[in-house]
């Protein structure tokens, strides 16, 4: 696999129904509101057709590392309420598949995400910092799971007072904190790379 190609499988287990999960995750425009730690801005480019596919959105996203990603998604397959598939283009290109399976009062959620990083920073440094970029993705998805639980609680609230009692979703990490964390992690990754390279030369 080329250094700039990534394959992530994320698993969440959330109390609710497949319909509830699909109604939240199938709406890219709402991501900016309920998953603000990652989705900084979302602009709808085209609505879905009657079959629920063709919806397109332009996104600005970030993790805890001090860089942003500009990309577009299009929903290309709809299996409501059991999931959907999307294609991505821009700073990364590839395909994502969401799958929802009911298990009693819970929903097992799987996100299969295969992409190539096309942002110049990621393309040029993936050979060295791929573990760091992977950790950045895992952090983003962990934020998503927490934010999804909070969004479901808000939607289920039966009064405005109950809705206000639900904590807000975690917001984006500041660039100052991200720079410190990213610098420490990058230094550690670079040191590990140099050690491995030195050992291979012996």
Question: Residue locations for each model-derived region?
Answer:
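Surface loops and adjacent helix of pleckstrin homology
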Residues: 36, 89, 112
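Glycine-rich portal/gate segments that line the openings of hydrophobic small-molecule binding cavities
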Residues: 43-95, 106-108, 143-147, 151-158, ...
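Terminal "cap-and-tail" regions of soluble proteins that handle hydrophobic small molecules
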Residues: 2-4, 14, 103-202
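Hydrophobic ligand-binding cavity/cleft-lining segments
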Residues: 1-50, 191-202
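Hydrophobic pocket/interface hotspot
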Residues: 20-25, 31, 57-59, 75, ...
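A short, polar/proline- and glycine-enriched secondary-structure boundary/capping micro-motif
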Residues: 68-70, 95-99, 119-125
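Short, surface-exposed charged micro-motifs
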Residues: 11, 74, 97-99
């Amino acid at each position: 696999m080329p250094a700039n190609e990534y394959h992530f499988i994320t698993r969440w287990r959330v109390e609710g129904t497949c319909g509830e999960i699909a109604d939240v995750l199938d709406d890219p425009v709402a991501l900016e509101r309920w998953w603000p730690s990652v989705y900084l801005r979302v602009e709808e480019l085209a609505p879905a057709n009657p079959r629920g596919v063709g919806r397109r959105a332009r996104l600005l996203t970030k993790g805890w590392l001090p860089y942003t990603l500009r990309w577009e998604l299009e929903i290309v397959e709809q299996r409501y309420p059991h999931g959907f598939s999307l294609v991505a283009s821009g700073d990364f290109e590839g395909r994502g598949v969401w799958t929802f399976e009911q298990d009693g009062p819970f929903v097992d959620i799987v996100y299969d995400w295969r992409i190539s990083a096309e942002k110049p920073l990621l393309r040029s440094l993936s050979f060295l910092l791929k573990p760091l970029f992977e950790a950045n993705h895992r952090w983003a998805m962990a934020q998503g799971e927490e934010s999804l639980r909070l969004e479901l609680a808000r939607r289920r609230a039966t009064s405005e007072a109950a809705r206000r009692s639900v904590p807000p979703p975690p917001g984006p990490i500041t660039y100052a904190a991200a720079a410190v964390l990213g610098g420490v992690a990058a230094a550690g990754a670079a040191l590990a790379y140099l050690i491995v390279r030195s050992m291979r030369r012996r």
